[in-house]
């Protein structure tokens, strides 16, 4: 089960990179809602989405943690999360899976819609 993954942290700029060993600490134990971006690092369309996602999170006054998982480096973790295509974004709150989006967002407003849903669900838990 995902909750049994042990701890360690790797930071890259203000974005966090989850590894098999850091997933529990970065995602499941976070006090903030977490947006997990799963992608292979070489895949250009997801780099554009990552920039848009980062900007949308900034607009939300850093209400969220943004965590990236490199599909190629962390294949077993991606497999646990049942990732089958890219880009895939997953929202977590209080260690619980809330929502998954696979494929590109049509616009920044759709990214904000996704974030609003996660934020609303997170507030219900507190």
Curated annotation (Swiss-Prot):
The keyword Transit peptide applies. The keyword Mitochondrion applies. Keywords: Mitochondrion, Transit peptide. GO terms for molecular function: protein-disulfide reductase activity. GO terms for cellular component: cytoplasm; mitochondrion. Signal peptide: none annotated. Its main location: mitochondrion. InterPro entries: Thioredoxin-like_sf, Thioredoxin_domain. Residues 14-120 form the Thioredoxin domain. It comes from the Eukaryota. It is found in: Mitochondrion. SUPFAM superfamilies: Thioredoxin-like (SSF52833). Belongs to the thioredoxin family. This is Thioredoxin domain-containing protein, mitochondrial. It comes from Dictyostelium discoideum (Social amoeba). The lineage of its organism: Eukaryota, Amoebozoa, Evosea, Eumycetozoa, Dictyostelia.
